[in-house]
Amino acid sequence: MNKIKIAFLVFSLILLCTGCIEDKAVVEKNTAVFEESTINADSVSDYDIAAANNAFAFDMYSQLARRETGDHENVFFSPHSISASMAICYEGAEDTTKEQISNVFYFPSNKTVLKVRMERINDKINSVNSDYELQTANALWVQEGYPVKETYIHNVQKYYDGEVTNLDFAGKPDASRDTINEWVEARTNDKIKDLVPEDAITADARLIITNAVYFNGKWMYEFDKEMTGKKSFYPTKEEDISVDMMYTCNRFNYGETSKAKIIELPYRGNDLSMYVVLPKSNNIEKFETEFTLNDYTELKNDMEVVEEVKTTIPKFKFETKTELSNSLIEMGVVDAFGQADFSGISDSPLEISRVIHQAFIDVKEEGTEAAAATMEEMAMGVSISWDAKPKEFTADHPFMFFIEDGRTNCILFMGKVEYPEYEE
């Protein structure tokens, strides 16, 4: 029997199948009434979804940072988006397929624990705040006539707030592609375009799961546009390029070790921040292979509120579109791409065929837009440094950055700037 192919596009997950199609959309009825798995409430609270998300973020970064050429490569992705999409897929996974996804994404074996925590964290992320825009959205697109289990549909709608829509992939692939891409564009302020490529929806397509994350925020302390000017940036010790560098001097959470400096640049509303990690040595390739989640956490925890930090970082704007299938296989999600068991979704066999992730970021004087506030005190600092000498944070060589939600402690976006460019 042929297996249904799952093309996983993050922000979109596509499940492809070769099973037969009936004239009307079919929802497989379960004889049992919907019953949530019986779990101890403590098991939900004990599962640290932020720790799982952040551990996966560093694992995926290690894959994306691998150099296939000698060219400078910026990195940007949303670990939360990838995890959220795979969580919806995980909801229907069984046996070794489920186990492997769990191991790579640090998901709990109890699916109810995961979906309850996902529901709670998405509620926090999507809570309205007039100081910034942050939203995440899920959708399940089903081939007309393809049988999907009622329990699965119920869980996607209830716990992941997923929209469920029937489309005719087989008869109208182009129209279906346009509909899905328009959905993604609408939820990312038109920043993510053409996520689903022309060759993605074939005659075998049966299910598409999409997740979109969008953030647009202004700095708590904006950079002065009049201070922005062309300055040197050094992609390597031997290279020197001229880029637009922004400058500000203000009170920030700041820290450093013998290997790196870190600064927290908060956004208005004080819920989200960008953390910039600058290696002291201009050797990003060596630094990123040694820099772990524990190192990052310790660096953040050791920050102090410094009254005056002279901060210089480049403006940058770029978009990435990456095939993640091989990376996930190397990380351990093997069976899902071949001998898969997604029987929790449908009795028709399914497997993942491809994974594509697309993300966009724009960092400028006013703030950050990623598709992927004025306050007197900082949320992060434990102590205050009264050193009369100002600290300097000059990001004139490659650095890593993280956009975190302080309410959930989740890394929503993660990346590396190795060659900053900015086009209006």
Curated annotation (Swiss-Prot):
It comes from the Archaea. GO terms for molecular function: serine-type endopeptidase inhibitor activity. The record marks 381-382 as: Reactive bond. SUPFAM superfamilies: Serpins. GO terms for cellular component: extracellular space. Keywords: Protease inhibitor, Serine protease inhibitor. Belongs to the serpin family. This is Uncharacterized serpin-like protein MA_3388. It comes from Methanosarcina acetivorans (strain ATCC 35395 / DSM 2834 / JCM 12185 / C2A).
